[in-house]
Amino acid sequence: MAPQMSQKEADIAMMLAAGCHLGTKNVDFQMERYVWKRRADGIHIINLGRTWDKLMLAARIIVACENPQDVICQAARPYGQRAVLKFAQYTGAKAIAGRHTPGTYTNQKDAIFAEPRVLIVTDPRTDAQPISETAYVNLPTIAFCDTDSPLKNVDVAIPANNKAKHSIGCLYYLLARMVLQMRGTVSAANPWDVMVDLFFYRDPEELEAKEEEAAAAAAAPAESAGYNAVADAAYGAESWDEQKPAEAFPTGGFAPAAGNWSEAPAPTGWDAQQGGDFGSGFGAMPPQGY
């Protein structure tokens, strides 16, 4: 029997399955410390042991905030928007999925002005605007950084693949679970009853196509049942197989006539004459030589 894996080993195995260790062909000089090795095709492999340690550090920072609403997580990349919303749902943080409005953290006259205590971003490149704004207000920033990501104004860099949908979903799932375990909401002895699949990005067009197929499959039996009900009402509930075929000839023979044919009443019409010479009923014929 194989020995049971520890929590760290199980998390690293999950990150390996999600592809969190796959970097890019380019490496930023500040991200070299997190690179384990370089493959033959040029892809750099990220050390997931360092990734897990940084996830624990980020979870401690988030738990230190007394009010969960003081934590804002952002994702301008489409693959990270669902993961951000799910993270906010389970941890109580605020989520900004989509385009960032400039001045959200610096313009006090803005209607959506916010003063969070911690900011979490999915990609330092696509989320460069909120990171630059946090530098003006001394806001701690946590970012998922790939091997080519710039670390300017990033306080806690979590090295991982931030371009794949499965990798982003897995990272936010692990971070949310760590936060809940440190708060005491989820027990470390028992596994979290939320599946990691809920954090993965889903294509809206693919979901719409699946819903249409399911609706069509559900409507087909209903239409067939309705047609059968109309047919039964019009032609009877009996099936065609239950109907007995009509007999070609009566099996009991023909019944005898009620009486003699000669006893029938004599006709009274113009064709009532019977027998005799032709024309006898038209009077005397003229002589032949007339």
From Swiss-Prot:
UniProt name for this protein: Small ribosomal subunit protein uS2
Annotated source species: Ostreococcus lucimarinus (strain CCE9901)
Domain of life according to the entry: Eukaryota
GO terms (BP aspect): ribosomal small subunit assembly; translation
A Pfam short name: Ribosomal_S2
A Gene Ontology cellular-component term: cytosolic small ribosomal subunit
NCBIfam families reported for this sequence: uS2_euk_arch
Compartment(s): Cytoplasm
Organism ancestry: Eukaryota, Viridiplantae, Chlorophyta, Mamiellophyceae, Mamiellales
Subunit structure: Component of the small ribosomal subunit. Mature ribosomes consist of a small (40S) and a large (60S) subunit. The 40S subunit contains about 33 different proteins and 1 molecule of RNA (18S). The 60S subunit contains about 49 different proteins and 3 molecules of RNA (25S, 5.8S and 5S). Interacts with ribosomal protein S21.
Keywords: Cytoplasm, Ribonucleoprotein, Ribosomal protein
Principal location listed in the UniProt entry: cytoplasm
GO MF term list: structural constituent of ribosome
Residue ranges of the region described as Disordered: 266-290
PANTHER family linked: 40S RIBOSOMAL PROTEIN SA
Function: Required for the assembly and/or stability of the 40S ribosomal subunit. Required for the processing of the 20S rRNA-precursor to mature 18S rRNA in a late step of the maturation of 40S ribosomal subunits.
Family: Belongs to the universal ribosomal protein uS2 family.
